[in-house]
Swiss-Prot record:
NCBIfam families: PRK05218.1. The lineage of its organism: Eukaryota, Fungi, Dikarya, Ascomycota, Saccharomycotina. GO terms for cellular component: cytoplasm; cytosol; mitochondrion; perinuclear region of cytoplasm; plasma membrane; protein-containing complex. Keywords: ATP-binding, Chaperone, Coiled coil, Cytoplasm, Mitochondrion, Nucleotide-binding, Phosphoprotein, Repeat, Stress response. Present with 132053 molecules/cell in log phase SD medium. ATP binds at N37, D79, K98, F124, R376. The keyword Nucleotide-binding applies. This is ATP-dependent molecular chaperone HSC82.
């Protein structure tokens, strides 16, 4: 019967071309990927059979079987899993690209290891590392048996199978190996790869092996006569006499060697989580981790534990060395924990088993108490699941603290998963305080190394009541912030928060060990002595005419203008109210494509324009205003320039950058002694433009010390 031909999705064609032409040496990982897929197919049929046992009647045994066929240069990998319908063969293997296809190709182009392929969900195509043609024979309980075939070109065929033996249920992958990859037909090589990568797969992996055995066979009549003749000719005395009648009755046989084929199970190891942790080597943990995670690296940390009492379950949880490429993608699978009930795999999609902020953790959980016939809906409402989840989170926080005891290990962990910890601080009310101890930041006293909140508290001077922090786009931006001056002068440490998620986390955290967390870009009370307080009150009165004049000039751009005791070197800064967005949060929210604009206008705090009475610029500006120059164009220009500069140094963006640029250009002209009238005269072609308003000589902008 002629098959139907289909075009591969373009990205899949590119991917196969990349793989088939790769010079990557460690090609053995193809077997790991195909066995992993087979194991997934077996998981699915076993789960279906929990609610409908008849599903297993088409093939009662659950297995993965490898059959080398050296004479044909073919390697067959069969599983008795769920199988694929015709539509699934077309969609899953060719016409619908998975989200990881493009991401994997980009990673490869960037120099990533091809053994990462499984993490991107495209492990099937790894077979083209060793084969240049493949047939997939598949039988699902809901459909006929079909053959899917491809030689990694631009198309594939799907044909109703009328030539191969019936497989009952499941899938056979028939790989036609390249001439330089025939080592994967050798028994020794296959066993080596299985031991390295797939020893802990939950289903028996059978290898069809050829063995030489000795058998006793009856001696043919002609050989018997020759034997008798030889006995007669033999003149040597016999050591013992045998009853002649007995000898007559005994059939004459001989031993011959012959080759037989038999199935040998390659993974007889019992489930790792059922064994005592003290009996398991790190190598075994590493091998098990790789078999369940598709990772090619060893894990960073392992947490193996059991909970007994009213509730019983065992778990092995792994913390990877790196974050996956799609860690925070919304469509990504939210859980990497396989749930078993009394050694029977139930699901790896129990999203309620672990909170989203811990979605990077991989492992297995085996419960003694959950019912076997759990549906997804029942999982969500099950009280036992909630208790298991609570225990898992508790044990993982324990593991993170154990990692923190080794600073080098913790640096690796934190660089990969800091965002997850911060997300946990934001979302997990119950464990917020424990997670806060894991947070690390640069600060004014720890610029080059990260410091913990606990260490910050131990360094606090006696008279310091709060924990201070500043938010911003980058370390460089916050290190030079004018907001730091007064706190540095008092020897108060300030934490640098430069990750967008930091501000969300701190907004929820609010305090640490009884100390309030204070954002210094917002309005706050700074600890001051009685002398400082008296001096501040005096300055407020002295500068009242200036603050009023500046407010009149700036109008609705600011809520108020105040004399600041929190600024030293900088002439001015913009601070926001305690309950609105900071400059940094305003920047983050502006970048949100789907933000609520009404919420933005409500949360964008009214700005307070703070001026420093210690700044020579502010002193000179005060002098000008006191002399009656509040309406002076220079004063207005300088005020606007001062305000816009303060916006930038305080982390805001300018609403009208062109006005700011014009003011700067006028300053440049003055600095270069360029008369604006002269400029216009030397550019007659620009005469059609509106004339520039002449500034009276007595109000010219002056250079201020």
């Amino acid at each position: 019967m002629a098959g139907e031909t289909f075009e591969f999705q373009a990205e899949i064609t590119q991917l196969m071309s990349l793989i088939i032409n790769t010079v990557y040496s460690n090609k053995e990982i193809f077997l790991r990927e195909l066995i992993s897929n087979a194991s997934d197919a077996l998981d699915k049929i076993r789960y279906q059979a929990l609610s409908d046992p008849k599903q297993l009647e088409t093939e009662p045994d659950l297995f993965i079987r490898i059959t080398p066929k050296p004479e044909e240069k073919v390697l067959e990998i069969r599983d008795s899993g769920i199988g694929m319908t015709k539509a699934e063969l077309i969609n899953n293997l060719g016409t619908i690209a998975k989200s990881g296809t493009k991401a994997f190709m980009e990673a490869l182009s960037a120099g990533a290891d091809v053994s990462m392929i499984g993490q991107f969900g495209v492990g099937f195509y790894s077979l083209f590392l060793v084969a240049d043609r493949v047939q997939v024979i598949s039988k699902n309980n809901e459909d006929e048996q079909y053959i899917w075939e491809s030689n990694a070109g631009g198309s594939f065929t799907v044909t109703l199978d009328e030539v191969n033996e019936r497989i009952g249920r499941g899938t056979v992958l028939r790989l036609f190996l390249k001439d330089d990859q025939l080592e994967y037909l050798e028994e020794k090589r296959i066993k080596e790869v299985i031991k390295r990568h797939s020893e802990f797969v939950a289903y028996p992996i059978q290898l069809l092996v050829t063995k030489e055995v000795e058998k006793e066979v009856p001696i043919p009549e002609e050989e018997k006569k020759d034997e008798e003749k030889k006995d007669e000719d033999d003149k040597k005395p016999k050591l013992e006499e045998v009853d002649e009648e007995e000898e007559e009755k005994k059939p004459k046989t001989k031993k011959v060697k012959e080759e037989v084929q038999e199935l040998e199970e390659l993974n007889k190891t019992k489930p790792l989580w059922t064994r005592n942790p003290s009996d398991i080597t790190q190598e075994e943990y590493n091998a098990f981790y790789k078999s369940i995670s598709n990772d090619w690296e060893d894990p960073l940390y392992v947490k193996h534990f059991s909970v007994e009492g009213q509730l019983e379950f065992r778990a092995i949880l792994f913390i990877p060395k790196r974050a996956p490429f799609d860690l925070f993608e919304s469509k990504k699978k939210k859980n990497n924990i396989k749930l078993y009930v009394r050694r029977v795999f139930i699901t790896d999609e129990a999203e309620d088993l672990i909170p989203e902020w811990l979605s990077f953790v991989k492992g297995v959980v085996d419960s003694e108490d959950l019912p076997l016939n759990l549906s997804r809906e029942m999982l969500q409402q099950n009280k036992i699941m909630k208790v298991i989840r609570k225990n898992i989170v508790k044990k993982l926080i324990e593991a993170f603290n154990e990692i923190a005891e080794d600073s080098e290990q913790f640096d690796k962990f934190y660089s990969a998963f800091a965002k997850n910890i911060k997300l946990g601080v934001h979302e997990d009310t119950q464990n917020r305080a424990a997670l806060a101890k894991l947070l690390r930041y640069n600060s004014t006293k720890s610029v080059d190394e990260l410091t913990s909140l606990t260490d910050y508290v131990t360094r606090m001077p006696e008279h310091q009541k709060n924990i201070y922090y500043i938010t911003g786009e980058s370390l460089k931006a916050v290190e030079k912030s004018p907001f730091l001056d007064a706190l540095k002068a008092k020897n108060f440490e300030v934490l640098f928060l430069t990750d967008p998620i930091d501000e969300y986390a701190f907004t929820q955290l609010k305090e640490f060990e009884g100390k309030t967390l204070v954002d210094i870009t917002k309005d706050f009370e700074l600890e001051e002595t009685d002398e400082e307080k008296a001096e501040r009150e005096k300055e407020i009165k002295e500068y009242e005419p200036l603050t009023k004049a500046l407010k009149d000039i700036l109008g609705d751009q600011v809520e108020k203008v105040v004399v600041s005791y929190k600024l030293l070197d900088a002439p001015a800064a913009i601070r926001t109210g305690q309950f609105g967005w900071s400059a940094n949060m305003e920047r983050i929210m502006k970048a949100q494509a789907l933000r609520d604009s009404s919420m933005s206008s409500y949360m964008s705090s009214k700005k307070t324009f703070e001026i420093s009475p210690k700044s020579p610029i502010i002193k000179e500006l005060k002098k000008r205003v006191d002399e009656g120059g509040a309406q002076d164009k220079t004063v207005k220009d300088l005020t606007n320039l001062l305000f816009e500069t303060a916006l930038l140094t305080s982390g805001f963006s300018l609403e009208e950058p062109t006005s700011f640029a014009s003011r700067i250009n006028r300053l440049i002209s003055l600095g270069l002694n360029i008369d604006e009238d002269e400029e216009t005269e030397t550019a007659p072609e620009a005469s059609t433009e509106a004339p520039v308003e002449e500034v009276p000589a007595d109000t010219e902008m002056e250079e201020v010390d």
